[in-house]
Amino acid sequence: MKILTETPISRPANGIPDVNYIENDGGAPSLCRKLNKALEWANEQGADWLCWHHDDLEIQTPELVEPNLRRAYTDGARVAGVIGALAVFVPQWWMNNRPVMTWGAIIQGYKDGREQLMADQPGYNPNMAIVDGCALWIHRDMFDARVEDYVNHLYDDDICFRALQRGYKVACLDVRCKHLSEGGYEFRDYQEASDRFMDYWRARAEFPVISGQKFKEVK
């Protein structure tokens, strides 16, 4: 299995070797454009899977990645992650129906040194609606997909929806990761991206979006 790893930030990531840094050039000033560039590059390299993750994410059990990906592929998944949602009502899925609709586990680190285990429903699940973009594995069957440009937001929701739209599944892997960043964003920028995301996908899907549902034809 050939897994290529790319990160949109410059610091080397722990847990997986041969990380390729996506620079802010070549028309890729946003995380969405960077992901599209990464998909194009992975396709050119003949990879089986693209591993896309933030530079501040540490994969603590890298030996479990390939077995989980084989299982996910067999189950029909072409996008995978480590934590996500079983249904999407609006893009801000962390703020809705947690812990009922979230699945997976991740160790979240904070700037003051604290750590919190987020594990509402840990373990493997091949029936996700979306998985979080801090760690994504995308199969070559999706390398021709391109996400809409929401600048630095919602690329994870978009690539997951595109997999579901094609009849594939999205899986949560049983892989332990530690995300060192506290995250954060300008709410106004996020809200603008969210509005554009919903305008695009409301024309193509019935909300809430869940695994296995049919998407609309758009002419």
Give residue spans per PLM region.
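N-proximal low-complexity "stem/linker" segments adjacent to membrane-targeting elements
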Residues: M1-N24
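A short, glycine-/small-residue-rich helix N-cap motif at loop->alpha-helix starts
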Residues: G26-L35, L39, N152-H153
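Active-site nucleotide-sugar/metal-binding loop of Leloir-type enzymes
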Residues: N36-W49
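Short, high-confidence coil segments that cap the C-terminus of an alpha-helix
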Residues: A47, G76-R78, Y168
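Short beta-strand-to-loop acidic/aromatic patch adjacent to the donor-nucleotide binding site
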Residues: A47-E58
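Acidic donor-binding/catalytic loop of UDP-sugar-dependent glycosyltransferases
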Residues: L57-R71
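Conserved catalytic core of nucleotide-sugar-dependent glycosyltransferases
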Residues: N68-D144
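C-terminal catalytic/acceptor-binding lobe
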Residues: D149-K219
